Amino acid sequence: EQFLSIIREIMSTFPSLLIVLEHITTCAAVEYIKQAPANVAATITVHHLSLTLDDVIGAELRPHHFCKPVAKCYGDREALRNVVRSGHPRFFLGTDSAPHLRGKKECSHGCAGIFTAPSTPALICEFFQGDVEKINRFANEFGAAFYHLSPTKAHITLERWDGSPNNTPRVRMDGPVEIFTGNDDGILPWRIIHDE
């Protein structure tokens, strides 16, 4: 939260600069953005909508949930979820995917980062309960509008399913990369059936 004072200094020096706080994780950051001028926004990752610090270092260490910024407490996660569900236009999706090999995560000096690229569409769809309008605003329109760009016309189609991404081809370099699914069973409730 100490970085917020630095953001205030930047805003004071460059009052018309577009400022985006990337991958916010705290209630304090949410409240700051809500009260900030229209040229200040924030991105939120799909995994920070799912995780708390307890999911990373609770009863056991979960290296595949370790990322930076680190997930925070339950109240912080709820603040992120609530502002995203509210449809506030200065909070939009910030994708962040780190496909570290299993051996680079499951070790005494593991890498920070979560592999979300294959699961982000499904996790966003589940978060919004399939509400296409809300998904499109959070993942497409709000960010484009903030940057004064046109939203993409491309679209994807997802369907509900009970399959596991772990049964589909995985990224391979020197070993497997764990796909983040937001649950312990490794199952994504949605899958892409059409990409355009």
Functional labels for PLM-detected ranges:
Residues 86-151:
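His/Asp/Glu-enriched, well-ordered alpha-helical/loop segment
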Residues 1-93:
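Histidine/acidic residue-rich metal-binding segments in metalloenzymes
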